[in-house]
Amino acid sequence: MARLTVEECMGRTNNKFKLVILASQRAHDLNSGASPVVKHKNSKNTIVALTEIANEQLDVHLLFNLAVQRCRKYMEKFINSDDSYVVHKSKDNIDIFQKNATSNFDELGANSLNVENSKFLDGDNFFLTQKE
């Protein structure tokens, strides 16, 4: 694929923003040492990731679940951090994101880290394949 366009990748997902999540996760995997499944010559990992998605050579559900797990690990580190900026903030000045993230994380509990048990994808029609 000499010139890859977003439209060529849209057959795998119904939303450009979801495509960005998928490509980002795959590029992260490639940067971490994963082997590409397509042949490429001096292409950047972002282009390789989009090519793999467009050629339907990846399980997009698995890729999305990996992205969710990576995001949850990041959020868990942020919420549980001993960062002096977060610790010394007065309770009145806690920003809305941090307050909501902390309360939602406490409500979800430890079981929320298991993507298979999560109802996050139920009924969302998150991925549209050409077979559907």
UniProtKB/Swiss-Prot annotation:
<keyword id="KW-0548">Nucleotidyltransferase</keyword>
<dbReference type="GO" id="GO:0003899">
    <property type="term" value="F:DNA-directed RNA polymerase activity"/>
</dbReference>
<comment type="subunit">
    <text>The RNAP catalytic core consists of 2 alpha, 1 beta, 1 beta' and 1 omega subunit. When a sigma factor is associated with the core the holoenzyme is formed, which can initiate transcription.</text>
</comment>
<dbReference type="GO" id="GO:0003677">
    <property type="term" value="F:DNA binding"/>
</dbReference>
<keyword id="KW-0240">DNA-directed RNA polymerase</keyword>
<keyword id="KW-0808">Transferase</keyword>
<comment type="similarity">
    <text>Belongs to the RNA polymerase subunit omega family.</text>
</comment>
<dbReference type="InterPro" id="IPR003716">
    <property type="entry name" value="DNA-dir_RNA_pol_omega"/>
</dbReference>
<dbReference type="GO" id="GO:0006351">
    <property type="term" value="P:DNA-templated transcription"/>
</dbReference>
<dbReference type="GO" id="GO:0000428">
    <property type="term" value="C:DNA-directed RNA polymerase complex"/>
</dbReference>
<protein>
    <recommendedName>
        <fullName>DNA-directed RNA polymerase subunit omega</fullName>
        <ecNumber>2.7.7.6</ecNumber>
    </recommendedName>
</protein>
<dbReference type="InterPro" id="IPR036161">
    <property type="entry name" value="RPB6/omega-like_sf"/>
</dbReference>
<dbReference type="InterPro" id="IPR006110">
    <property type="entry name" value="Pol_omega/Rpo6/RPB6"/>
</dbReference>
<keyword id="KW-0804">Transcription</keyword>
<comment type="function">
    <text>Promotes RNA polymerase assembly. Latches the N- and C-terminal regions of the beta' subunit thereby facilitating its interaction with the beta and alpha subunits.</text>
</comment>
<dbReference type="Pfam" id="PF01192">
    <property type="entry name" value="RNA_pol_Rpb6"/>
</dbReference>
